[in-house]
């Protein structure tokens, strides 16, 4: 025989007083992040919330990127979310990183394709994964570096997007090293010229205006 439905009285149902605020914050986060799969994202959100981890939430709503050549689903905003969740570690476990990727409703085949650019075993240096993600957004090496600066900077949005030159040069060498068409001598000559400007004017920092020129259509 089927078991009878369990009945609860009002005194037995405990609703924590903070639930209303939790749901308000969740709703705001969902609106900002606009997840493709709300159920998947919600599971990741509340899992992170229960552990006290950084939440998979964008800082703001993103408009679609017309310049992205392939529809990977990946955006600068989502990379920034991953950076918040992973940057406290120098190396991240691929299994944990893949789960965070899935929680943002990104296709897992794109995650694996990204790792094929620089295959590794169980872990990857976070800054390298971030660099690969920036390169996946499309465009040139300088465009990838632009995305990197805008993610890593502590400057206000729309500001110079400065980061330490040491970080910039490390990532630039890494990405250029993955491209067999870029001679190492060209990379070093380019970084040397940028370093002189950074040392002279920026206190060891480099910003977008030092290397990135937006081409305007006439």
Curated annotation (Swiss-Prot):
One of its GO terms (biological process) is flagellated sperm motility. One of its GO terms (cellular component) is radial spoke. It comes from the Eukaryota. The keyword Ubl conjugation applies. Signal peptide: none annotated. Keywords: Cell projection, Cilium, Flagellum, Ubl conjugation. InterPro entries: ROP_DD (IPR047844). Functions as part of axonemal radial spoke complexes that play an important part in the motility of sperm and cilia. Important for male fertility. With ROPN1, involved in fibrous sheath integrity and sperm motility, plays a role in PKA-dependent signaling processes required for spermatozoa capacitation. This is Ropporin-1-like protein. It comes from Bos taurus (Bovine). The gene is ROPN1L.
């Amino acid at each position: 025989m089927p078991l009878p439905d369990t009945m609860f009285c009002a005194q037995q149902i405990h609703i924590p007083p903070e639930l209303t605020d939790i749901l308000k914050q969740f709703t705001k986060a969902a609106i900002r992040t606009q997840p493709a799969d709300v159920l998947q994202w919600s599971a990741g959100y509340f899992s992170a919330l229960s552990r006290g981890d950084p939440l998979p939430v964008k800082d703001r709503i993103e408009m679609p990127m017309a310049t992205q050549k392939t529809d990977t689903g990946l955006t600068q905003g989502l990379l920034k979310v991953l950076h918040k969740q992973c940057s406290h570690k120098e190396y991240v476990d691929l299994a944990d990183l893949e789960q965070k990727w899935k929680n943002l409703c990104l296709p897992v085949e794109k995650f694996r394709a990204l790792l094929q650019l620089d295959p590794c075993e169980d872990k990857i240096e976070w800054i390298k994964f971030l660099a690969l993600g920036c390169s996946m957004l499309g465009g040139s090496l300088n465009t990838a570096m632009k995305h990197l600066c805008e993610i890593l900077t502590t400057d206000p949005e729309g500001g110079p997007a400065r980061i330490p030159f040491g970080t910039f040069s490390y990532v630039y060498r890494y990405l250029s090293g993955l491209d067999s068409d870029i001679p190492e001598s060209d990379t070093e000559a380019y970084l040397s010229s940028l370093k002189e400007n950074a040392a002279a004017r920026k206190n060891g920092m480099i910003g977008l205006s030092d290397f990135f020129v937006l081409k305007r259509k006439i």
